[in-house]
Amino acid sequence: MAPSPSKRKERSEDRAKERGKEKAPGKEVTEKDRGRDKAKKRRSGSSGSSSSSHSRSSSSSSSSSGSSSGSSSGSSSSASSRSGSSSSSRSSSSSSSSGSPSPSRRRHDNRRRSRSKSKQPKRDEKERKRRSPSPRPTKVHIGRLTRNVTKDHILEIFSTYGKIKMIDMPVDRYHPHLSKGYAYVEFEAPEEAEKALKHMDGGQIDGQEITASAVLTPWPMRPMPRRFSPPRRMLPPPPMWRRSPPRMRRRSRSPRRRSPVRRRSRSPARRRHRSRSSSNSSR
């Protein structure tokens, strides 16, 4: 028997549905596969970008580290070169200063040397003046002489040692024929005075031991420079208004001092009153 057309339509529809069902999971599978592929691609892209970024960052860090290391090495090299140059410059400057000083330093050194040289003779002169030997004495003091010794005796004794220039023998005021007990003998040469000192110090004259000592001549006194003081300015006379008040005061005081206080006028009145009262009582 031949199937009816309605059954044929149903069968065709069922077949179409089955085919559609079969196609739908395939589409779903294909869509899922496509989504997975896209996700994988995205992941791979992100991983690639991240890896590239990582590589870039690592490369940048490596480049920065390299640059920093390079810069540090460069800075260290520059610092070392600077230190080397500074040390070399210092050594060169020290060697130059030690070896050949600059002209300005030479001038200063020459000036200092010239100043020191110029100052030295002045110091030498001062030292010579200070160290100059004191003049040898020519005058001898003779002490502890007895009053019987005279100038002639001293001249006779001390003339044996050299030429005597002067003999000074002070005399007592109250007894002009007697000495004060000492005398000064001045020789012409200092050697003669030294000889007299050696022989007569502790010697005896007129039975008494005497003393002989050198007399140092004082340094000649230099006259002090006179300082001319400026002339004193005469003060102007005081004005007239200052002169007048003391005169007026003197005039006003003088009559007060001269005029005595009169008290005699009261006494006779009292006496009269008393005399009257006494006369009335007697009456």
From Swiss-Prot:
Residues 10-36 have a biased composition (Basic and acidic residues). GO terms for molecular function: RNA binding. The keyword RNA-binding applies. It holds the Pfam family RRM_1. InterPro entries: Nucleotide-bd_a/b_plait_sf, RBD_domain_sf, RNPS1_RRM, RRM_dom. The keyword RNA-binding applies. One of its GO terms (biological process) is mRNA splicing, via spliceosome. Residues 161-240 form the RRM domain. Belongs to the splicing factor SR family. This is RNA-binding protein with serine-rich domain 1-A. The lineage of its organism: Eukaryota, Metazoa, Chordata, Craniata, Vertebrata.
